[in-house]
Amino acid sequence: MKKQEKNTALELEAFVKEKGVQFGKFVSGWLTPKRLFWFLLVVYLLSLVPLLWIGFYNYPSADDYSIGSDCRQAFVNTHSLLVTVWTGIVRAADDWLNWMGYFTSNFLMALPPNTFGERAYVWTSVIMIGALSLSTAYLLKVIFCRVFHADKYLAGSVILLMLFITVQRMQGRVEAFYWYSGAANYILVHSFCMWFYGLLISAIYDTGKKRTGKLVGASVLGFLVGGGNQMTALNGAVVLLAVILCVSLQKKWRTYRAFWWPIGLYYLGFLLNVAAPGNWVRAADATGMNPVKAIFVSFYYAFDYCINEWSGWPVLFLVLILIPLFYNMAGKTDFSFPCPLGVIAFGFCLVAAMMTPPLFAVGSMEAQRLQALTYTVYILVVTLSTGYTAGWFRKKLDQKNQNQQFSGNTARYILFCLLFFTFASALAVIPTPHYFTFSSAITDLANGSARAYGEARKERIAIYESGERDVVVKELPAQPELLYFSDIQEDPEFWENKGMCKFYGFDSVRLQKELK
């Protein structure tokens, strides 16, 4: 009897193994890197549709009016693009002298889309999401395909997975994608930085006119990024310093002497940024930390935000699904991926360095746009660190197989990860509709708050442009999660009210709240 039971168990085990192997072969034959890439591309693009759709109800607020007022008046009075741009340059120079040193950001904020009409503001989300997606994709494609000779479909899959987690779990979404002044200062300048890195790395593998063109582009971008928000500017300065040290230790400066120009112009922009007279004017009203304390506290904040707040199950999913993809990608490079712990530590230092400037300047990381930028860099660092570690592990095993197709086990694992993510996402969205950016957009579109907000803002514009000198507007009926940043107050002397007066040219504006 026992022998019969044992034979039955062995037969069942053999049957399960056989079916498992057959299923693995079926999945590996169906789930190829190419099909995975196209599937992820469709998913990512579809996930952006609600984000762009809700952008049709987006309207400017706060600094979009106060900082953008000079360019608005220039355009209304002259209808000249050149005069308007020149006015933005003059405004940036004035802010550099009297308020803040990031001259690139000053110019971008001085020229918001609503300069050319309120409805031009709908392009804000398109610009920010598009710039972030395209610049990140360009940089990572250069790293994966040109440096490490990875399969383009595997590289594309990694990029899309990273972008999905970055965009759909973004912190401070309204200030990252929908409020122009905040997004231009941080996300747009960060995107310039990604293009700068990508052009520099790509130029290494080019010759002749191609290299020259990319170095010229990198030089322009380097100067602009160095003059951008000080979080991105400092981060880039640290990365370039590490590059300079590596090249110096290898004594290869003769080989890369042409790269002095973009690097030098980057540091020129950075020095003009941090040494601006306006920084001292603003610092007089700020309560920041001393530099040493800011550095130490930034490491604590990096642990606190990255581990306690941002590293939920979506980030864990990202790491787990990237491991086999990077493992396959590492088969086509001879690079040995030395010292992975050192690379991970350097990545963590970069995330911490993002937090040092605001801690030094204002003593906190509370502004959502600061968290949005730091989160974006954090996910990038997690992705690259995962890839580097997976490559190191593969080289340790010394596997020479360069077949880029998925094995049965790998295909089953990837399929399981995708199904798990779908199931977990449904469980997360049901009780928390704003969990993902796309679910937040769908929620506000479906419940009508986005439409109500947009119609109320449209009615206000008609009042603003009616020619009245003392304007009174009603309270907004809704505050959509992705669209609402701030509003004018009942006090006509409030700074946002004054900025709107300057933008439209009337004497006063105030909010009239409904009696409850």
Write out the residue ranges for each language-model feature:
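Transmembrane alpha-helical segments
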Residues: 132-144, 192-204, 238-246, 319-326, ...
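Intrinsically disordered, polar/acidic, low-complexity terminal segments
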Residues: 15, 24-95, 99, 113-156, ...
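Transmembrane catalytic cores of multi-pass membrane glycosyltransferases
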Residues: 52-122, 180, 226-370
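Membrane-interface micro-motifs in multi-pass membrane enzymes
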Residues: 63, 152-201, 229, 353-387
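Individual alpha-helical transmembrane segments in multi-pass integral membrane proteins
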Residues: 118-134, 183-191, 226-227, 233
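Short, Lys/Arg-rich, polar N-terminal cytosolic tail immediately upstream
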Residues: 1-30
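Short hydrophobic alpha-helices at membrane interfaces in multi-pass membrane enzymes
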Residues: 202-224
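Membrane-interfacial entry segments at the cytosolic side of transmembrane helices
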Residues: 210-214, 250-264, 335-342, 400-421
